[in-house]
């Protein structure tokens, strides 16, 4: 599966002049090597990290933590934020703060925190759990899941220590235009790159 993606990664690297991250099906340091040589700037792992936390260490030691994003899909179950794998289909035994601390200890460079409860709803990011996670570790946290308005981005950056915010549907369906969001956030004093 991974090797079918190599042509796509190479094509993106040739045609896009911004850093990009590749994930899905990455199980070994060799997979990472192939993707980085193909042009990926960073890689992201999720299920394979949970199933084999030493993979985080192996990747970090061989390629540097700066290229490793550990993606963490979470859902609130009976008041506890649990970690899920396999595209959100399978609950793990990990509570989110416990897992991100393990990921950081093993060498994760960043955490991509996706609230499955909020994903696609456009009702705003999960601010409380994002803040709890960001305060529990010393690596960057990217919030994901729920963005619906420009103010949602302002809120996640002012009420949490999240260093980034990921959104998809609001951009795909032109609910928010990226230049407008940048203008809004800049005018509110949020530093952007």
Residue positions per predicted region:
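Short, small-residue-biased leader/transition segments that mark boundaries at the very start
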Residues: 1-2
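Alpha-helical segments flanking ligand/cofactor-binding loops in enzyme cores
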Residues: 10, 33-36, 57, 61, ...
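Catalytic cores of alpha/beta
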Residues: 20-21, 26-39, 128-165
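Short beta->alpha connector loops at strand-helix junctions that form conserved
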Residues: 24, 45-48, 168
